[in-house]
Amino acid sequence: MRIAYFITPHGFGHAARAAAVMKAIHQFHPSVHFDIYTLVPPWFFEESIPGIFTYHETLTDIGLVQDTPLEVDIPATILALQDFFPFNEKNLIGLEKELCQSNCQLVICDISPLGIAVGEKAKIPSILIENFTWDWIYEPYIKDHPQFIDIIRTIKYYIDTANYHIQTLPTCRPD
């Protein structure tokens, strides 16, 4: 069985969680092979899950553009998001073909809406795993940057499109 795993490159925490999930799945089903789609470098996965994945260098998510670990560049984030959404149809078709040709039977996404879109296009079930989603991260910026409204709407659509939604603890949510 092959599982496609789309992982946001915004920090290694998501990749660490994804590696732990893949390792646990592989322990229960040793025949599973993962196709990892991300910009997180492959060396990050090689030590924890060696030999059970194929790496595909893919921009799966924008997150926030940061000048430093604590400084966010909102105008650059908006530009990057407007370039990323809506998804490029040619890119979606290419990823759909890859998943179908490799006989992927499931798409798992660690907060990456791209994987959900590809799963939907390929008619492959998708699972969203998250402890936060980008829509609510962007919401406080709407007042000064209304460009986020359409971006948030698009992200919420894909969150709702996932066949399964797993929210992990601790959950980061606005109250």
What does each of the following model-derived ranges do?
Residues 42-44, 107-122:
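An aromatic- and histidine-rich active-site surface loop
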Residues 96-112:
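Short N-terminal targeting/anchoring amphipathic segment
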Residues 125-175:
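Active-site-proximal region of nucleotide-activated glycan assembly enzymes
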Residues 32-86:
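Conserved nucleotide-sugar phosphate-binding/catalytic loop shared by glycosyltransferases and other
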Residues 12-16, 44-45:
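Short N-terminal binding/cap micro-motifs at the start of the first secondary-structure element
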Residues 15-26:
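Short amphipathic alpha-helix
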Residues 1-11:
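Nucleotide-activated donor-dependent transferases that construct or modify glycoconjugates
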Residues 2, 105-106, 164:
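Structural motif
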